[in-house]
Amino acid sequence: MGKHYCDYCDVFLTHDSVSVRKAHNSGRNHLQNVREYYQTLEPECIQQVLDTLAQEYDLRGIEKPRDLLQPAGSSFMTFGAGPLSGSSDRAFRSQVPPSRMSMGGGVGGGSDRRGDSRGGSGGYGRYGNNDGSRDQGAPPNYSRPPPQGGPYSRPPPDMMAGGPPGISNGPYPPRGPPLGYGAPLPGAYPSGPPPNMRGPPPPLASNGSHAPHSRTGYGPR
């Protein structure tokens, strides 16, 4: 694939494709070179170029841009003070007809709910502004929480008396362990060792040998 040569910038692009040419033509250096080139031409030459471009749009059945409808030398043209001139967006929007600005279209934004035009991104902000900024304050349908000491700052009258509704106004009974987990009642378990448990070993005799075991398992009789 061959390389594309730009007459305005006097450079060869990496290759000739629609995406590469489009990216180059939208670059800042290319637009500046185009403006400088047309500023050196006479108004008659500029008008001839505009007429040629307008004929191409008519042959292809494409709607012509606004810049082609302006006379040569107009400050609204692309290489004058239009969107490609590098001037401020506010100066460019001031030349837009009022009918377009009042419809909310505008250039880069529209009219917000307060009536003034913004140059923001066009969408609505958090509370309704179309410039993407945030207002100071609450949204329209926001309800404030109840103040301190309001109707919900204290418990109901029955709860303040100390007992739940339907019960005498006394303090709550102390909380104990769950049912079945309290201390065992007296006599619940038999005293003494288990039936088949052997007793402790007998003491040593004077000669160092163990005394004979008893048959009951509880030491000598």
Swiss-Prot record:
Its main location: nucleus. Component of the spliceosomal U1 snRNP, which is essential for recognition of the pre-mRNA 5' splice-site and the subsequent assembly of the spliceosome. U1-C is directly involved in initial 5' splice-site recognition for both constitutive and regulated alternative splicing. The interaction with the 5' splice-site seems to precede base-pairing between the pre-mRNA and the U1 snRNA. Stimulates commitment or early (E) complex formation by stabilizing the base pairing of the 5' end of the U1 snRNA and the 5' splice-site region. This is U1 small nuclear ribonucleoprotein C. Gene3D superfamilies: Classic Zinc Finger (3.30.160.60). Residues 178-190 have a biased composition (Low complexity). SUPFAM superfamilies: beta-beta-alpha zinc fingers (SSF57667). Keywords: Metal-binding, Nucleus, Ribonucleoprotein, RNA-binding, Zinc, Zinc-finger. It comes from Mycosarcoma maydis (Corn smut fungus). It is found in: Nucleus. A zinc finger (Matrin-type) spans 4-36.
